[in-house]
Amino acid sequence: MELLAPNLRVVFCGINPGLSSAHQGYPFANGSNRFWKVVHQAGFTDTQLAPEQWQQLQDTGCGITALVARPTVAASEVTRDELLSGGEALKEKILRYQPRALAILGKQAFSSAFGVKNAAWGRQEMTIGKTEVWVLPNPSGLNRATLEQLTESYRELFLALK
C-alpha cells in the first residue's frame, strides 16, 4: 500500500498499516481514521476520496507510504528498532523520488525513526535531499486531536506548498 512517484508535492507517511487496512488492501481504511476527510478539508483533494480510491491521490500530486510495513492493531505495537530501520528505508525512498515535502504522521514516530528529540509540529529544520520534512498529527481515531485541529495542521502544509 505505497504510492510513490517522482516529483510529487507531498508524500504522507503513516506509522504502519492497521489491521483494517491490511485486510482491505487500502491505506487509512479504518472507519475511525480521519485521513481522507482531513486531506480533503485541508485542500489536497477536490473531493473526499474513499480508501478504495487511494491510488487517485497521486493525481493530486500526493503519495503515501509508511515507516513500517507490518500491520498491527495499534501503532504502539511497533518497536523502536522497526521505526529506526523504517526511517532509514524512508530516507532512501525520499532521496529516490524527491517529493517537495515529506509529512510524517506522528511526532513520536518521527522522533524514534530519525533520532530527533523534542520535535515540534510542522516544518522541521532537517531535509532529505531537497525534500522538506514536516511532522503532522496522526489522523487515527485514537488521536485526541479534533478534526478541526488536524485540518488546520494539514492546511498549513498545503498552503506552504502552493
From Swiss-Prot:
Domain of life where this protein originates: Bacteria
- Enzyme class, broadest EC rank: hydrolase
The catalytic activity of this protein is classed by the Enzyme Commission as 3.2.2.28
Keywords for this protein: Cytoplasm, DNA damage, DNA excision, DNA repair, DNA-binding, Hydrolase
Gene Ontology biological process:
base-excision repair, AP site formation
**Presence of keyword DNA damage:** yes
- UniProt keyword annotation of Secreted present: no
User: Which reactions are catalysed by this chain?
Assistant: Specifically hydrolyzes mismatched double-stranded DNA and polynucleotides, releasing free uracil
Q: Which locations, inside or outside the cell, does it occupy?
A: Cytoplasm
Instruction: Kindly list the GO CC terms recorded for this protein.
Output: cytoplasm
GO MF annotations, alphabetized: DNA binding; pyrimidine-specific mismatch base pair DNA N-glycosylase activity; uracil DNA N-glycosylase activity
Question: Any S-S bridges, and between which cysteines?
Answer: none
The similarity annotation says: Belongs to the uracil-DNA glycosylase (UDG) superfamily. TDG/mug family.
Quaternary assembly: Binds DNA as a monomer.
Q: Tell me, what does this protein do in biology?
A: Excises ethenocytosine and uracil, which can arise by alkylation or deamination of cytosine, respectively, from the corresponding mispairs with guanine in ds-DNA. It is capable of hydrolyzing the carbon-nitrogen bond between the sugar-phosphate backbone of the DNA and the mispaired base. The complementary strand guanine functions in substrate recognition. Required for DNA damage lesion repair in stationary-phase cells.
Q: Which NCBIfam families match?
A: PRK10201.1 (NF007570)
**What name does UniProt use for this protein?**
G/U mismatch-specific DNA glycosylase
The species this protein was found in: Serratia proteamaculans (strain 568)
